[in-house]
């Protein structure tokens, strides 16, 4: 009887040889007795490989059978120290995760700082399956704030991979929104880096701090701009979600109910469709009456610095009309100020600047001040007077007022320095006039000569007129 059983194992179901890809693991085709007998004959390592294959392919029946055999534990470790639950989470198989958890698998297991929850959040699968896995793990007290060796938490992995509902569920379960990894990245930074707009909006709504910098001093908005996610850059630079922090006041159950029934994209697209953002490029074009060029420049990722250094052929290449080119080139000519590295020059070299060059510098500096005044006036006219007309909630007003106060101080310092410059020029002028060794300029010499010539001519004419009168008088006598 045993011999017949062994012969039965030689050929798998369907007439295929035992060397086939399935290796006879067709559930329900061979009888239970023959499968268990074959399982007992397999070495432990080979059985573990079969178990791993069943986990990765989602063969729940085979997993249950191997667990029931008693040879493999639900918390057994395979190569690299992974447990069955970690394998199931890595493929986002929610059914397997549930089965293993019901069998007593440890949801808080970790290997080299790699937790099962992190594995689930970074799994390759649909967001629906990943969400179910994460929800199951959290229900078994998995800690959402345990970080990996790179100090990345589950919410960072979920934000990086674009799983909006997973991010919201983690926050509702106690995940810290503003935790930073070894590079200073937060979940918001990761979402901005990868271009996940819906997650950026959701994180702002959940209280994420957009002003936290990375270790190299970059804000999430700058990370988004560097990776060419301009819409996210504008959102993070000029606006905040009007519902920022609102969900933090709700209970865990209310939050979960709200976040799982809200479509962030649909809810927020209309909110941000009408906001106006003012950057250096927008202000510059607005001052020239070229607002229609803004979208074109943004589409081609052209910054104000690049615009100021463009040549005429580059304007044509980028689709600028001749009239627009003339406006921009004229403005560039007015703004052009030759930088003089005074700190690198010797004292003698500093004195070689001509009066014309210095006057030209002052004139251009005055024009730039005028442009700055115009830019501020444009901003003032665009800002709504009534706070109720502001569609989006801004950051703390103290940030704006503090910057304005600093700007006022800088303007006052500039005014003081210009007054000092004026006094110095006046002092130099007075000293030059009183200096006996002063050599008059050619213009001054020519003016003095012209005065002498005029006086000489008047004197000659006077003598001539006097001589003419005297002559007439003598002739009459």
Swiss-Prot record:
ANK repeats lie at residues 46-76, 80-109, 112-146, 150-179, 183-212, 216-245. SMART domains: ANK. One of its GO terms (biological process) is cell differentiation. The modification Phosphoserine is found at residues 17-18, 20. InterPro entries: Ankyrin_rpt, Ankyrin_rpt-contain_sf, Asz1_SAM, SAM, SAM/pointed_sf. Its main location: cytoplasm. The keyword Cytoplasm applies. Residues 274-336 form the SAM domain. GO terms for cellular component: pi-body. It is found in: Cytoplasm. Pfam families: Ank (PF00023), Ank_2 (PF12796), SAM_2 (PF07647). Keywords: ANK repeat, Cytoplasm, Developmental protein, Differentiation, Meiosis, Phosphoprotein, Repeat, RNA-mediated gene silencing, Spermatogenesis. Signal peptide: none annotated. It comes from the Eukaryota. Plays a central role during spermatogenesis by repressing transposable elements and preventing their mobilization, which is essential for the germline integrity. Acts via the piRNA metabolic process, which mediates the repression of transposable elements during meiosis by forming complexes composed of piRNAs and Piwi proteins and governs the methylation and subsequent repression of transposons. Its association with pi-bodies suggests a participation in the primary piRNAs metabolic process. Interacts with DDX4, PIWIL1, RANBP9 and TDRD1. This is Ankyrin repeat, SAM and basic leucine zipper domain-containing protein 1.
